[in-house]
Amino acid sequence: MIITTWIVYILARKGAGLPFPPKVSSDVEVTETEAVSVVQHWLKKTEEEASQEIKEKMSTNFPPMQGQDVHVTRDVVKHHLSKSGLLANQSQEVLEERTRIQFIRWSHTRIFQVPSEARNEAMRDRIEQVRRSICHLSDEISQELRNRNSYSEC
């Protein structure tokens, strides 16, 4: 159904003399530097918020001696959390670790722009493939109808 709708849309545009795909693209161009800067900003903000929350939790559970600065590392946090019994909810820890891993994977992902020629060529290939499929199906249907008509005449 979806393929048929697209084919009708494409054929209607071609019949009206309009190009497919339209020459004016509504897509917003994304460059790698913009994406990287957004990810870095978000990561920095998240790390600052997490560090602040951890410092607050540690200061309420283990108040530092006067004049001591609180330095937060993953090892210290895990050590204090396991001692204080805050790791009762293991599923939350697993979820946070998975989220962290996914974020790291996503932050290392590169964003590449596909040249419009390659995109147009891929679109033409796909349209041609769909046309061949439709022609093949219509040939099969017409052959089947001929066979039914020949059987009904007998």
Swiss-Prot record:
It is found in: Mitochondrion outer membrane; Mitochondrion; Cell projection, Cilium, Flagellum. It comes from the Eukaryota. Its main location: mitochondrion. The keyword Cell membrane does not apply. Residues 1-24 form a transit peptide. Keywords: Cell projection, Cilium, Developmental protein, Differentiation, Flagellum, Membrane, Mitochondrion, Mitochondrion outer membrane, Phosphoprotein, Spermatogenesis, Transit peptide. The modification Phosphoserine is found at S26, S116. InterPro entries: SPATA19. GO terms for cellular component: mitochondrial outer membrane; sperm flagellum; sperm midpiece. Disulfide bonds: none annotated. One of its GO terms (biological process) is spermatogenesis. Essential for sperm motility and male fertility. Plays an important role in sperm motility by regulating the organization and function of the mitochondria and is also required for correct sperm midpiece assembly. This is Spermatogenesis-associated protein 19, mitochondrial. The lineage of its organism: Eukaryota, Metazoa, Chordata, Craniata, Vertebrata. The gene is SPATA19.
